[in-house]
């Protein structure tokens, strides 16, 4: 794979930066809009019954620790649909980003990230660009080098302990951390592993990494021309990379 030179922001978009975008444009995020059943039902298996109208209200998924071990294939055990949760109220009604303006913005859909990037006269990176940026130009295993994860609690914000019920918080953060809280990689980029997931412009296609090597070098790949997730075949998805404060070796590693 070959890519042309490109610029990338030093850190994830903070609440302060996203607030500037909202103030300037009046943009309303996906999580702040009531759900249009006619729009969403085409992303679900045929025959899925319509939920009650009081469920189809503006909201987002909020993480809650479980009381003990659960099936890690069943994310409904720890992700809970919460009406009123959005970027200004990350944990739902009654929560606030006050005191967290330097934290990365959360509850941001692909459409929201794309809209912010356009407003800022930028764009989302391709997955290939993101991968190169995360590498820091090295062949190291992690953005911080080759130190194993258990010895890297001062290098990135991720889950220490047993997911999703025992977080030892050895890195000092049970949730998001302010941007630039941990050391940068060799390119000077922060949080290329951990803290929050980061959007790429590519469509998600499970077959993206299979290609005919006889074609030689692929220049500036920008992903598949189709959405392809056999687990949720009707849902259009885009690539996210980098992991988050909820990731550890047992989950999303």
Give, region by region, the residue ranges found by the protein language model.
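A short N-terminal beta-strand-loop micro-motif at the entrance of redox/enzyme domains
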Residues: 1-5
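N-terminal segment of the mature folded domain
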Residues: 11, 31-32
């Amino acid at each position: 794979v070959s890519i042309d030179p490109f610029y990338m922001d030093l850190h994830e978009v903070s609440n302060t930066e996203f607030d500037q975008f909202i103030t300037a444009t009046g943009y309303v995020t996906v999580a702040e809009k009531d759900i249009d059943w006619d729009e969403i039902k085409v992303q679900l298996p045929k025959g899925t019954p319509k939920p009650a109208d009081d469920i189809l209200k503006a909201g987002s998924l909020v993480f809650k620790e479980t009381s003990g071990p659960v099936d890690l294939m069943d994310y409904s055990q720890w992700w809970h649909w919460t009406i009123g949760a959005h970027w200004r109220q990350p944990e739902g009604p009654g929560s606030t980003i006050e005191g967290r303006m330097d934290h990365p913005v959360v509850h941001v859909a692909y459409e929201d990230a794309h809209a912010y990037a356009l407003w800022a006269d930028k764009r989302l990176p391709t997955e290939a660009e993101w991968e190169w940026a995360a590498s820091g130009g090295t062949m190291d295993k992690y953005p911080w080098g080759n130190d194993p994860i258990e010895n890297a609690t001062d290098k990135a914000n991720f889950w220490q302990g047993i997911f999703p019920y025992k977080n030892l918080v050895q890195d000092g953060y049970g949730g998001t951390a302010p941007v630039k809280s941990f050391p940068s990689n060799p390119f000077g980029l922060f949080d290329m592993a951990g803290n929050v997931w980061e959007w790429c412009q590519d469509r998600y296609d499970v077959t993206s990494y299979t290609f005919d090597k006889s074609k030689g070098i692929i220049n500036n790949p920008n992903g598949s021309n189709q959405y392809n997730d056999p687990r949720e075949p009707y849902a259009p998805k885009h690539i996210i990379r980098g992991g988050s404060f909820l990731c550890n070796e047992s989950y999303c590693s």
